[in-house]
């Protein structure tokens, strides 16, 4: 009986502290592509943004409510926001009808493509490295084992841009894409460093 109890304890500990990943047949992923980091002047203010397309090739209707979070090497964090004036300026610049963060959310049908723009009013002009994390493109998650102390993580799309120059002297619409891939990202406030997909 004691041997059985000991074995049960080992099995329980293995389950408790191992990495738990959502079953592959239970998660879905939307296709995503972007055009890089750009800038537009709105009432004398330089606004950063990226335009993108999201396509549903999953074979079923999905709910799409994205979150665009930017973190910089200057330790500043900002989120995409709605701005009618910036949206109109960007539409004119690109000659394309685009949806802002408030308009793009909702159901996305099989085969449907939504064209959107993520607008960042408070992107630090002194930042050289811009890290963009996009949630809502998949429902994939995992729970990392206790030894690694990663906790609960969701899969997000990660883009790392490098901006040459400094401050107001940065070349307009010039950024170098360093990373453009899926990663696992912890949901805890203290866990800001991404864990690369293996």
Report each predicted region and the residues it spans.
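Short, solvent-exposed loop/turn segments enriched in Ser/Thr/Gly
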Residues: 45-51, 114
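The feature marks short-to-medium sequence segments in extracytoplasmic or secretory-pathway proteins
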Residues: 55-109, 144-174, 180, 186-198
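Bacterial N-terminal signal peptides that target proteins for export
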Residues: 1-8
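Short Pro-Gly-centered flexible turn/kink motifs
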Residues: 107-118
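Bacterial N-terminal signal peptides
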Residues: 8-18
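Low-complexity, acidic Ser/Thr/Pro/Gly-rich terminal tails and inter-domain linkers that flank the onset
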Residues: 23-45
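Short, surface-exposed ligand- or partner-binding patches at beta-edge/loop junctions that are enriched
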Residues: 115, 121-147
């Amino acid at each position: 009986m004691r041997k059985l109890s000991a074995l049960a304890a080992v099995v329980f500990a293995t389950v408790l502290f191992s990495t738990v990943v959502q079953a592959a047949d239970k998660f879905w992923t939307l296709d995503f592509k972007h055009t890089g980091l750009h800038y537009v002047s709105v009432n004398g203010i330089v606004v950063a943004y990226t335009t993108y397309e999201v396509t549903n090739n999953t074979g079923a209707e999905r709910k799409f409510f994205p979150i665009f979070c930017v973190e910089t090497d200057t330790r500043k964090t900002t989120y995409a926001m709605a701005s009618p004036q910036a949206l109109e300026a960007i539409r004119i610049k690109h000659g394309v009808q685009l949806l802002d963060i408030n308009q793009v959310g909702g159901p996305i049908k099989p085969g449907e493509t939504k064209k959107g723009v993520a607008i960042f009013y408070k992107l630090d002009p002194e930042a050289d490295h811009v890290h963009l994390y996009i949630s809502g493109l998949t429902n994939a998650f995992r729970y990392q084992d206790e030894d690694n102390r990663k906790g609960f993580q969701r899969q997000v799309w990660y883009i790392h841009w490098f901006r040459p120059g400094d401050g107001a002297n940065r070349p307009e619409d010039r950024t170098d894409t360093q990373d453009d891939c899926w990663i696992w990202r912890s949901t805890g406030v203290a866990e800001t460093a991404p864990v690369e997909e293996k």
